[in-house]
């Protein structure tokens, strides 16, 4: 929702929750009751915007915070069995798979373990900032995305049957200036 606090100041907020659970799975019956992968239990966002005309110019500043709860990236979670058949026959892959150490570095404490037992990535929050000054035909904007350079995992595609995972780190801090001309 939104709340117009004053003529120039607005607060926006949002919250969503998903209570997803795996009912049944033929190839891995032991995962029934686990969380649906790739779906955090909740997300939330908060933004404060100050938008003020100063003479013929418009000055706008906006700070945003977005939070994502813990998320599992595989149907196998916690102390579930590591594989339905004790490994992949003929490939010499043992039942206990190794998750790349890079996942620990990206998530810090409590992120993905070096064991296939834990396929959860910790919650994280990102702060963005924008400040714009504009006239009738132009706008100059300075911005910072992921202002505090939060390290987080953006996506994990688990492939334990093949000995690991494909990991995409979250977006690092980026900052810049944009110029817009309307003609």
Predicted regions and their residues:
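C-terminal beta-signal and adjacent terminal beta-strands/loops
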Residues: 66-88, 132-183
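Flexible, solvent-exposed coil segments and beta strand-coil junctions
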Residues: 22-30, 105-112, 154-159
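Surface-exposed loop/turn and secondary-structure junction residues enriched for glycine/proline
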Residues: 8, 12, 21, 25, ...
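C-terminal beta-barrel architecture of Gram-negative outer-membrane proteins
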Residues: 39-134
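Gram-negative outer-membrane beta-barrel transporters
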Residues: 1-76, 178-182
